[in-house]
């Protein structure tokens, strides 16, 4: 035990995973960190093994993926683990962010922790998009063409910048090579950001469902929370196994089993399900440039939450108005996800525009307004209480 505390590396592990004091009342909503860590480890390991057999070439990419599936020992398992864990990764990230928004985890003193988390989200989406292109099926090619073409909205240099990203005049061998290179590199950057996220968390410790700060009533991470985390990790592995072994393509797109053909456009070009809400925001605005800016701002606006939430109370658990508005925001997010998967036609265009307007209004109008209303009501109540106390005295 003494070595565990004094050794420079083991001591670090001890302070994070064994002796770290955690609030005794944190619920299962605080388990997503460990689940995301497991997802990241699975993704890096399976990704490295897939890269050993993958060929980043427009002629051989699709064939090399089929080779992995048919000829490599347990190649099908590695690929399906990689594809389905990516979906679970995003499910857990969205739940993690939702918990952060509900319980006010972005408020001081955890603003740095929140900011690093938002950067991780943006990087995850970039990595997911790069990976979606690599099998080089129909959705891969046309998804890459559509999304990279968004850069052409940049004034003056847009088209030149798109061709710079492509390495030619269309999606070609150079594009696939650089996408593969970046898709291999960026998860390690993501792992470094995850380490920074943990460092920032360790500075002030975890928040808790009550939203109060304090060093009393805490428990060591091990054994209490290691075993609590193991419960959700095993449930996740069971759910992942169900998808991998029984319905491995449920969260994918069947068009990606058709080899990429630049001469034939698919009936509908849609990204993976976890990018659909932001794709819906992009499509809801007629102006290309404003649509692209709105799509990026829909993610980056999360960075503003510590400023936009004007309430003196951390979290929504004791704030009925905020709690109601939070669930309307969740409903709006799911509506956007549905709209992103539909064709660009009435009434989906109108519903998407309304949902996009509410998405931004929630951050810029609803959250600040509710905070101001609550603060005002508290001030009035406090003033009345003080005046009645003075009358009694």
Curated annotation (Swiss-Prot):
What cofactor requirement does the entry state? heme b
Q: Name one Pfam family in it.
A: Cytochrom_B_C
Q: Which domain of life is it from?
A: Eukaryota
Indicate what this protein is called per its UniProt record: Cytochrome b
Q: What topology does the record note for this protein and the membrane?
A: Multi-pass membrane protein
Mostly located where? Answer: mitochondrion
Q: Would the keyword Iron turn up in this protein's UniProt record?
A: yes
Additional information: Heme 1 (or BL or b562) is low-potential and absorbs at about 562 nm, and heme 2 (or BH or b566) is high-potential and absorbs at about 566 nm.
Q: Which molecular function GO terms apply here? A: metal ion binding; ubiquinol-cytochrome-c reductase activity
Q: Which residues bind heme b b566?
A: 96, 197
Where would you find this protein in the cell?
Mitochondrion inner membrane
CDD domains in UniProt = cytochrome_b_C, Cytochrome_b_N
How it assembles, according to the record, is: Fungal cytochrome b-c1 complex contains 10 subunits; 3 respiratory subunits, 2 core proteins and 5 low-molecular weight proteins. Cytochrome b-c1 complex is a homodimer.
- Residue ranges of the TM segments: 32-52, 76-98, 113-133, 179-199, 225-245, 289-309, 321-341, 348-368
Q: Has UniProt tagged this entry with the keyword Membrane?
A: yes
Q: What does this protein do?
A: Component of the ubiquinol-cytochrome c reductase complex (complex III or cytochrome b-c1 complex) that is part of the mitochondrial respiratory chain. The b-c1 complex mediates electron transfer from ubiquinol to cytochrome c. Contributes to the generation of a proton gradient across the mitochondrial membrane that is then used for ATP synthesis.
Residues that hold a ubiquinone according to the record: 202
A single GO cellular-component term on record? respiratory chain complex III
